Amino acid sequence: MRDLKTYLSVAPVLSTLWFASLAGLLIEINRLFPDALTFPFFSF
């Protein structure tokens, strides 16, 4: 039961950190390449 409580307290923290970093990454990509349908570093 103690392991379950530890899991339930760790999982929201990790998911919050993950989604916050993912949102920040998407915001920075959209700031550097606004309205980009194709990214210049992918087209060779």
From Swiss-Prot:
Membrane topology, from the record: Single-pass membrane protein
Keyword check for Transmembrane helix: yes
Keyword terms: Chloroplast, Membrane, Photosynthesis, Photosystem I, Plastid, Thylakoid, Transmembrane, Transmembrane helix
CC per GO annotation: chloroplast thylakoid membrane; photosystem I
Main location as per UniProt: plastid
Residue stretches spanning the membrane: 7-27
GO annotation (BP), single: photosynthesis
Coiled-coil regions, chain positions: none
Domain of life: Eukaryota
InterPro entries: PSI_PsaJ (IPR002615), PSI_PsaJ_sf (IPR036062)
Compartments reported by the entry: Plastid, Chloroplast thylakoid membrane
Annotated family: Belongs to the PsaJ family.
Function noted in UniProt: May help in the organization of the PsaE and PsaF subunits.
Protein name, per record: Photosystem I reaction center subunit IX
